[in-house]
Amino acid sequence: MAAMMASITSELLFFLPFILLALLTFYTTTVAKCHGGHWWRGGTTPAKRKRMNLPPGAAGWPLVGETFGYLRAHPATSVGRFMEQHIARYGKIYRSSLFGERTVVSADAGLNRYILQNEGRLFECSYPRSIGGILGKWSMLVLVGDPHREMRAISLNFLSSVRLRAVLLPEVERHTLLVLRAWPPSSTFSAQHQAKKFTFNLMAKNIMSMDPGEEETERLRREYITFMKGVVSAPLNLPGTPYWKALKSRAAILGVIERKMEERVEKLSKEDASVEQDDLLGWALKQSNLSKEQILDLLLSLLFAGHETSSMALALAIFFLEGCPKAVQELREEHLGIARRQRLRGECKLSWEDYKEMVFTQCVINETLRLGNVVRFLHRKVIKDVHYKGYDIPSGWKILPVLAAVHLDSSLYEDPQRFNPWRWKSSGSSGGLAQSSSFMPYGGGTRLCAGSELAKLEMAVFLHHLVLNFRWELAEPDQAFVFPFVDFPKGLPIRVHRIAQDDEQE
């Protein structure tokens, strides 16, 4: 544990000058524009300030506010010392200064739902400009209003329940088996790396029909790794910085997508049905009026969204299950039953009916998402003055609904830091309704993750084949940390042992 924290701390210290410079740059271009020196009060008139009842809180240090405390590394199964101390002192709704902006932080389940349900009316998505700079201005993550609705509609149509059943389920199973069958017996490797390999290859295939293992696919994956390092770095476009390297990788990735697009347009112009490919690129070209730039950003952002969060959720499931043999046993029994029914039908591939029978598997998935919190918080901006639970939240302020704080709230979840998938077995049990209404791993409202059903399908199918074919344990101690996104410092090294087929069929 100490070694992991030391490693993370040294990484934080390495990036500290870049973060400080970025914040100072942001301050000189944005925060300093606030008039009258009353930026903490939102630039309101003296009369209005007297009437406002802002949430309690503190501004922190000049320029940087409380950003470093908020971003301090901590275990993923906790909210961190900063949040714990602020909630204990100020309550679940408090004000702060984060990322160079006046901010309200919400650990309140009701307010978080209120924020997500009032997207476009009282609040709107507001990520740092650097995210738009690297993902693209047409990325669904940063778009608001009608452009976002149009992009989301395309994604939802492509990920419809019909396509999930007929196209994506077989693809998910095929890519799962490609990964698992390559594992040598009694071998040791990074589970996080394998999860990333699985989800990346799946998304590359379904976005642009790129096959796993091919040189072009591997080259794209290497560029994507560099790209991801820049997404979570300080936005300094200087030679040698992670952000600068990420922008170069972005250009290389877009170059691949553009070449694929040109090839596809040429094929479509010849109306050659034999070469038609049922992927998102073809869908966007045929089913929408998007511009070339919009399609490029759409495909890049979905490659990002469909790969990063799903792979981390899968790695977390492997980690949590390793520490809960009882859950592994119940999971294996559920999937042995499904496998037996497959054999009786004379089938060897999963059907949609098989997937719907994975009841305990869904409990494991829910508990993994609740405890691991891949998406910790969301960036929103207040676009109209809001009054909630006696507090005034001024227009123009940032507001961060912290999903992790609600998922780890002891008033909503009994023993919240314990992995307990059985808590999801019955919605009629004590606290069932409160759990379901406060459980928001994929966001909510009009910005509910378009790929949430695909993400759950990926986890369920992978776990099906994993528990039927392997036993595993940690090869060395590791734990998921938040810095600022969830990651395993050592990549989650595991040792796997293949289960004999005779044992599987008992």
Curated annotation (Swiss-Prot):
Domain of life: Eukaryota
Annotated keywords: Brassinosteroid biosynthesis, Heme, Iron, Lipid biosynthesis, Lipid metabolism, Membrane, Metal-binding, Monooxygenase, Oxidoreductase, Steroid biosynthesis, Transmembrane, Transmembrane helix
Pfam families: p450
Molecular-function annotations in GO: fatty acid 2-hydroxylase activity; heme binding; iron ion binding; monooxygenase activity; steroid 22S-hydroxylase activity
Disruption phenotype: Slight dwarf phenotype and erect leaves. Impaired response to auxin leading to reduced epidermal cells length of the lamina joint.
Membrane-topology annotation of the record: Single-pass membrane protein
Tissue expression pattern: Highly expressed in roots and leaf blades. Expressed in shoot apex, stems, leaf sheaths, inflorescences and flowers.
Function field: Catalyzes the C22-alpha-hydroxylation step in brassinosteroid biosynthesis, which is the rate-limiting step in this biosynthetic pathway. Catalyzes the conversion of campesterol (CR) to (22S)-22-hydroxycampesterol (22-OHCR, 22-hydroxyCR) and of campestanol (CN) to 6-deoxycathasterone (6-deoxoCT). Required for auxin responses involved in the regulation of epidermal cells length of the lamina joint.
Pathway in which this enzyme or protein is active: Plant hormone biosynthesis; brassinosteroid biosynthesis
Residues that coordinate or bind heme: C449
Gene, per the UniProt record: CYP90B2
Provenance organism: Oryza sativa subsp. japonica
Annotated family: Belongs to the cytochrome P450 family.
Name of the molecule in the record: Steroid (22S)-hydroxylase
Requisite cofactors: heme
Practical applications: Null mutant plants for CYP90B1/DWARF4 produce increased biomass and grain yield at high density planting.
